[in-house]
């Protein structure tokens, strides 16, 4: 079986899915103590890198996704599927798991 090479630019989410690059979590506390990976909070902030075409409605039309590529978003803590590509962390979310846009 041939190996599949996946590049971030080739990821095309389906339906109402949104592909988000995770913002790095804090490496140390306010007091300067370095945190091990096991003590870090799971990130909830990221930048949208790809969006799907939207959820299909009963009449066959699609509901547009409210976020666009480049938007910063806040998402549910345990939502989505974590993906690592090229040493970077990403998460594939349903649009409903996005809580807010961040200016």
Swiss-Prot record:
Q: Which Pfam families does UniProt cross-reference here?
A: Cpn10
Q: Which GO terms describe its molecular function?
A: ATP binding; metal ion binding; protein folding chaperone; protein-folding chaperone binding; unfolded protein binding
Q: Name one GO cellular component term.
A: cytoplasm
Subunit text: Heptamer of 7 subunits arranged in a ring. Interacts with the chaperonin GroEL.
Superkingdom per UniProt: Bacteria
Q: Where in the cell is it found?
A: Cytoplasm
Q: Which HAMAP family does its entry note? A: CH10 (MF_00580)
Q: Which Gene3D superfamilies match?
A: GroES chaperonin
Q: Which family does it belong to?
A: Belongs to the GroES chaperonin family.
What's this chain's function? Answer: Together with the chaperonin GroEL, plays an essential role in assisting protein folding. The GroEL-GroES system forms a nano-cage that allows encapsulation of the non-native substrate proteins and provides a physical environment optimized to promote and accelerate protein folding. GroES binds to the apical surface of the GroEL ring, thereby capping the opening of the GroEL channel.
Q: Could you tell me the keywords of this UniProt record? A: Chaperone, Cytoplasm
Name the Gene Ontology biological process terms. chaperone cofactor-dependent protein refolding
Quote the gene name from the UniProt entry: groES
Give the organism, scientific name. Gloeothece citriformis (strain PCC 7424) (Cyanothece sp. (strain PCC 7424))
Q: What is this protein called?
A: Co-chaperonin GroES
């Amino acid at each position: 079986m041939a190996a599949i090479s996946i590049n971030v630019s080739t990821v095309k989410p389906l339906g109402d899915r949104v592909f988000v690059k995770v913002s790095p979590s804090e490496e140390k506390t306010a007091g300067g103590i370095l945190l091990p990976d096991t003590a870090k909070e799971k990130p909830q902030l990221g930048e949208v890198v790809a969006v799907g075409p939207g959820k299909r409605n009963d009449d066959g039309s699609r509901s547009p996704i409210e976020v666009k590529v480049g938007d910063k978003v806040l998402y549910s803590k345990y939502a989505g599927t974590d993906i690592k590509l090229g040493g970077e962390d990403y998460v594939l979310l349903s649009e409903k798991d996005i809580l807010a846009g961040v200016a």
